Amino acid sequence: AENLPAYRLELVPEKVNDLDGTIQALGRIIDLPEDALEKFQKNRSRHRVFDSVPLKFNLTEAEVARFAVDRHNFAGVEVVPYLARHYPYGELMTHVLGYVGRLDENDLRRVDAGNYRGTTHIGKSGIERYYEDQLHGLSGVEQIETNAQGRVLSVLERQDPEHGDDLILSLDVQVQQAAWDALGERAGAVVAMDPRDGSVLAMVSKPSFDANLFVHGISADKFREILNAPDRPLFNRALLGGSEPGSTFKPFVGLAGLELEVITPDKQVFSSGNYYMPGGSRPYRDWKKGGHGWVDIYGALEQSVNTYFYQLAYELGIDALHGYLTQFGFGDRTGLDLLGENRGVLP
């Protein structure tokens, strides 16, 4: 994520004689969508008297130029430069980085509102939200004395702002891109970790969406389109989805069998290609037609023999297996520094 220079249109309602007429006149030189006007009215209610209220973000160069020509006709209205959040990797990183969006009443209830005076955006999801306090820093304050015309006479008090922290992530863009490409057109998730320290090198959830759409305020129509898409691009499959662990689960079952002395390293089980629960008639199949023959734990792991681990899990029993697997974090959250992670399911 990076910050890029941009311009926003804002006004001080108390300094505008005819607010409705002024907004209509502004609409003739600057495109003001209905969504922007609705957000302006909502923002007015939470701003203090004589505070500037944003009317539109991310003005085009043409809009800035047109306003500059007619600026003398708009008392109390200003075009203000600011730094806008930009996500150069677009949808590739959205589900892990998250995004910032317009500050609203719900946001103010979870932060120190006094530290967000003059702030228009806040972390809404992902890394941006989890580390909001560190990234935001401290707002500056300046108390001034003015005359009746609004001219500054003196500065009574000043507290300089403090820059937020920079974050260096463990993510590797090349690994992230490789994971993204590997999924192709399929919906799914890929997480790549460094086994030496558990750091996350890639976290992909697909399909995704472009976080830049939310920075300046997404239109209601566009949001409905994304929200109602059948492939659910807003759903973070890496963080919220539940998937069977597949054969990656087998080493843990094998280790449980060894440590609880249900098997020995040289105990062999015959794999015929099908496994039947005692008293049952439903076959649970091996991946290899005809099975693998006699295998011990080494061969079962090497060849990923399904039937060996079906039998071992049955001999362990659900209570012993459950108790052992909880030691490895199955059925719990990982503690990843992202909000909203679901727990795993462990019978």
Each model region followed by its residue ranges:
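Extracytoplasmic/periplasmic proteins that interact with beta-lactams or build/remodel peptidoglycan
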Residues: 1-189, 204, 208-237, 242
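Beta-lactam-recognizing serine transpeptidase/beta-lactamase-like catalytic domain environment
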Residues: 146-158, 195-248, 252-347
